[in-house]
Amino acid sequence: MIERQKQIGFGWIALVIVLFTGAITGGVMTRRARHIADVSQDSSLPAAERQIESDYDEALSTVDENYADDIDYEKASQASIQGMLSTLDPHSTFFTKADFDRLKQDHEAEFYGVGVSILRHTDAVYVQSVVAGTPADKAGLRYGDKIVEVDGKDAREWTGDQVSKSVRGVRGEPVTIKIERAGAQAPLYFQIVRDSVPQPTVRAAYMIRPGTAYVALTGGFASETSDEIEKALTDMQKQGMTQLVLDLRNNPGGLLPQAIKVAGQFLPRGYPIVSVRGRTENAQTLVYKNTEFDGAQDFPLVVLVNRNTASASEIVAGALQDHGRGLIVGETSFGKGLVQHLFTLPYGDGLTLTTQKYFTPYGRSIQRDYSSGSLYDYYVRHDPTDEPAPAAPRSPTLPSSPNTHDLASQPTPQPTPSPKPAGPAVRTAAGRVFYGGGGITPDIEVKPLDVATPVRARIFEVAFHFTRQLAAGQIAGLENYRVDKVLYGQHPRATDYPVTDRVLEAFREFVRKDVGTFGITPAQIDADADYARLRIRDEIVTAAYGVEAGSRTLLDADPQLLKALESLPDARRLAEMVRASSAS
């Protein structure tokens, strides 16, 4: 959760940062060190702060005068600041000017680039999809283009982040991208003028079934998020929406005011949404209520969360769960209940600094424990039983094993029991009991399909390379799968680009010719043929209709979404139960 703060203004941290960065940019550390010493002896400062500054001054001078090699002062400065912040919590972080500018761009939901989604595969970074109407779309970049150079620099060994940083830049300035395209005899060059690229936080909104709307708020919480949700709900109601699935999975959070506004669109006016407590001038508890919307519609609502649902999205899920407004389905959320402010440093660098903690309407702390100091434990191992596994490339795709709850026999939905409650219990007005201190626990737990197994990770990889050739008309006998133009905004019929037995056999042959490269055999594909079909279907639909259509293909077989749809009658019963308790 991030809020804005234009200037830094907090105690000795600011003083040390300003003095150290000033010393380095001044270029004369010993003279600057004497100035620091004068400041550190200022009797108006507390003794503890004077001691800290004195020790810092001594260490700085000793390094400057005695280190055996040249000193990278900028690197030393950045490491010093980050080291200090890392002792506080996992979310207080230092940013260089370039990274800080990028962070602020992300929260303004706009950046200057070309409009492509990219991903690092085994041998290079490739274009996964192109955003309709952007400079990249107009220039002719396509799904599957292999990025070879950016502005004359060899990019074949770059990470996706390196390519992204190089492609982004000043609005109106060109960037030259050299690509290799399946079926092309020679590399192609594109000079593309950078422009603003919209980054909507509502990534999908459509009627998934008659009367049932699906809205994916998965792109964070930026300055326009509340407006996007309001528009999506209005559009869905015009199309006959009577019940809703709100998808908050993989939403990393963002701006606190936007989280409050989004939650307010589902709650009666005056309802509390979140309380915030700080240590200094914010030490008093601030309770934020719905003051803008009459969001008391009583249509059934199911909210999807997973382990990557964090911060602002947990505020929304927690408020809806506390008030009984929505049924939560999925996995226990990330557990980030700390509020950061953005602080700008004198030379354009910046900080995100934790200044407050937030709590659900009934007082639950969402923040997970981070006292071990291990960032691996905090970000990867959500509980001690977790084992490390390869990162899943995309969302789960196939129905999983039976769910842990069968709501057909539970007319009054209850939260999933937590075996080891991390915080104190709270009881809502409707008599439901929840525990704080460990994220938002779903009412119905549904595990995603394990797509991170070694075999499935390889199927994902080879499916992309196969479809890259398929969409270019390079697979013998399947030339009719060639994609000449992307039909954005359309959803394919089941008969469009079907993954038939013939396609699957071509896939096996593609693997058979290059087993050494992909590390998978046709027999392994046969053992997981349904997953292979789904991966190919996702890729070819993405190539032909864009990433939104590809995502819908995956959602059609998403076990968590399928359970959410199945649970809508239980969401209706929950709403009726809460209304009855409020009336009594």
Q: Where do the model's predicted regions map?
A:
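N-terminal positive-inside, membrane-proximal cytosolic segments immediately preceding the first
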Residues: 1-10
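Cleft-lining beta-strand/loop regions that shape enzyme active-site pockets
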Residues: 2-3, 36-38, 47-48, 52, ...
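Hydrophobic membrane-insertion alpha-helices, especially the h-region
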Residues: 12-26
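Hydrophobic single-pass membrane-insertion segments
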Residues: 26-36
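Acidic/histidine-rich, surface-exposed loop or edge segments in extracytoplasmic proteins
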Residues: 35-44, 57-66, 211-212, 542-548
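Sec-exported extracytoplasmic/periplasmic mature domains
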Residues: 60-69, 81-93, 108, 122-123, ...
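Extended, small/polar residue-biased N-terminal targeting/export presequences
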Residues: 64-128, 172-204, 274, 558-565, ...
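Conserved functional hotspot residues or short segments at active or partner-binding sites
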Residues: 365-366, 370-584
